[in-house]
Amino acid sequence: MDKRFAVVLAAGQGTRMKSKLYKVLHPVCGKPMVEHVVDEALKLSLSKLVTIVGHGAEEVKKQLGDKSEYRVQAKQLGTAHAVKQAQPFLADEKGVTIVICGDTPLLTAETMEQMLKEHTQREAKRTILTAVAEDPTGYGRIIRSENGAVQKIVEHKDASEEERLVTEINTGTYCFDNEALFRAIDQVSNDNAQGEYYLPDVIEILKNEGETVAAYQTGNFQETLGVNDRVALSQAEQFMKERINKRHMQNGVTLIDPMNTYISPDAVIGSDTVIYPGTVIKGEVQIGEDTIIGPHTEIMNSAIGSRTVIKQSVVNHSKVGNDVNIGPFAHIRPDSVIGNEVKIGNFVEIKKTQFGDRSKASHLSYVGDAEVGTDVNLGCGSITVNYDGKNKYLTKIEDGAFIGCNSNLVAPVTVGEGAYVAAGSTVTEDVPGKALAIARARQVNKDDYVKNIHKK
């Protein structure tokens, strides 16, 4: 197989987005458009991927990291000029180069693979990805000869009345023989109304050289959607959401209301898991089998076990074990590890805490910067007092400890194995194992106090 290369065009500012955020960084289902494109391209067994950056170059590089190499297009002088920036990386390479726009987040690796196969089978020097549009207004038209061969691409504004009736459009994705691409690109002129160097002009150059130019027509126009404004962004979001949700349902996940369920493209969900409406799953999330999520739950960059239930709650950058019950209205904050068979109940906040197997915090508690052992019970209103205004301190609650209601554990402090803390205590010193800590004022009852008040 020939070596494969990819050039992703991501230099445009995207003025029609009317945004401070550069166009290709606008998210679709939680992931920037350009990252969707790059991630799909990387499935093609590439030898090298080059992203052409311009506006927002540093932000794009930061987002993509080492997934790509980069070339800067300092002035946006057209698509051919953009591809030419990759010349130092690719001009001396033998193989095929696929050129993709960074604002086409719905394009799949499967479609690009089919285009590459068509390119190879036809022994073409250039292959165009085309699609049939119900309304082709604004798109370049694919003009074919009587025998079906591609003759040229005509931009909408330059098309004749007859040519505008053509519904097969240029999607802006191409495959080239690498040597032919960089030989022809040096011949592209900017003699046009915009004064720019257009990549479609390479077709006529190659045809004039007697080279084969092919086209692969995808049956899915949605895939080729280019995002240039917020309307198209909304359409891409909807199409991507439908694709992601359909994949999970086909893999055995139940979505009670797919239209109101938002799942990251990077989420992995086990079979027989049920997701209720209003659930938002962001980033790299793993969810086991037979789990119930939602309604109205947000999970971000976390791992959730099997047979776990999370209702009306937030889990962020944390790990939750098997057979856990969370919520309603619980908040698992970053760097928390929740063990197996745990209960985290109403209005409980957990932050940066190891929470052991079979332990419980059922109501109205804050547990931060803590190590909670196994079989621990935190009564209603238990608080780890972890912050002195400057530093955070560790609270350790060892296996089998029982913390009574409305207790404050002032860190740094340790409650030993099997120890009890009496309700209403403020604990400032370590509690030995098996001991009972009582840290509250002794109750005093004053007889007839209220009666005497009312006499005054």
From Swiss-Prot:
Residue span of region Pyrophosphorylase: 1-230
UniProt superkingdom: Bacteria
One GO biological process term: cell wall organization
InterPro entries membership: Bifunctional_GlmU, GlmU-like, GlmU_C_LbH, Hexapep, Hexapep_transf_CS, NTP_transferase_dom, Nucleotide-diphossugar_trans, Trimer_LpxA-like_sf
Pfam families found in the cross-reference section: Hexapep, NTP_transferase
Region (Linker): 231-251
Subcellular location: Cytoplasm
Cofactor note: Binds 1 Mg(2+) ion per subunit.
Enzyme class: transferase
Keywords of this entry: Acyltransferase, Cell shape, Cell wall biogenesis/degradation, Cytoplasm, Magnesium, Metal-binding, Multifunctional enzyme, Nucleotidyltransferase, Peptidoglycan synthesis, Repeat, Transferase
Annotated stretches, region: N-acetyltransferase: 252-456
GO molecular function, a single term: magnesium ion binding
Cofactors named for this entry: Mg(2+)
GO CC terms: cytoplasm; membrane
Reactions catalysed, as given in the entry: alpha-D-glucosamine 1-phosphate + acetyl-CoA = N-acetyl-alpha-D-glucosamine 1-phosphate + CoA + H(+); N-acetyl-alpha-D-glucosamine 1-phosphate + UTP + H(+) = UDP-N-acetyl-alpha-D-glucosamine + diphosphate
EC number assigned by the record: 2.7.7.23, 2.3.1.157
Keyword field contains Metal-binding: yes
Biological role: Catalyzes the last two sequential reactions in the de novo biosynthetic pathway for UDP-N-acetylglucosamine (UDP-GlcNAc). The C-terminal domain catalyzes the transfer of acetyl group from acetyl coenzyme A to glucosamine-1-phosphate (GlcN-1-P) to produce N-acetylglucosamine-1-phosphate (GlcNAc-1-P), which is converted into UDP-GlcNAc by the transfer of uridine 5-monophosphate (from uridine 5-triphosphate), a reaction catalyzed by the N-terminal domain.
Protein name per its UniProtKB record: Bifunctional protein GlmU
Originating species: Bacillus subtilis (strain 168)
Gene that encodes it: glmU
